[in-house]
Amino acid sequence: GIPASRANEYYQKCLDACEDLMELKVNGAPIYGLYQKSSDLTQNFVDLFLKKDDNPEIIFARDYSSEGNTHTWTSANIPYSQRSIATGGAEVNPGLNLVEAFEFIDNRDGKLKTRVNEDDANSDYIYYDNIGDIFNNKDPRMAATIMVPGSTFNSKQLDIQAGLAIWNESTGKYTLRVGDITASDASKNLYEGIQITGSDGPSSKDYYITHTGFYVRKFMEESTAAVGGSSTASWPRYRYAEVLLNAAEAAYELGLTDKVYDYFNQVRTRAGLNKIEAPTMEDIRHERQVEFAFESLRYFL
């Protein structure tokens, strides 16, 4: 490790290295910067990981091509109803904790709103008009990182439904009925002709279907080749957003509040979020969690 007495020296070297990289130019123009090509902020974050040409954010990456050098990320994580092979799909299941880590645009608390009064466990549930409305106004990066109920992939809306809430006249309560989308007998997933569990799960009956109700979106390619097991998306090892957050963290440790504000909020602004006036270390760590999900930079998401 590094002796505590040399901590500031270490942070200063980190900050200097980050700022040197920020200042690299060719013909007066910066070499690296945040990827900002689309006004649709969710699509912009999707494209960041799929567009290889004119992408100033990627500093180091492992590249793949269609000429025998591919990977299987898309086929390994494809939604259940879109599989091209029986033994593929949903190998990585995002959890609710990651979904809720993404803030709402107008509220930094990303917890999903399920009850009219969140402080009362007996409060009535909120009845949303559309299945995806509970995720409205989330940080645009969420929909580019995770597929949720109501998401679309390959021009097809995912059918994610845990079961049916059926009214019981005798008890005056709803009871939850769960079906089995993986059963060979389709009738086991029907209630009075209505499908119980969605065709994309969730279910614990099969390894290749989501168990949490969510699928990975980041790095997923909407192409026949990728769905069939030949993905060519690059894997970033180091990108400009990490340079900014490394610089922000080092500046925080050195007490350079103006630099913390600048570097940290560049990442948030690109995502369409409001700036934070005085970012804390917890804010920086949280930003890393949502910005770099599934990029092998954290042990726990």
What are these regions (language model features)?
Residues 1-89, 109, 113-301:
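Acidic/polar-rich alpha-helix caps and helix-coil junctions
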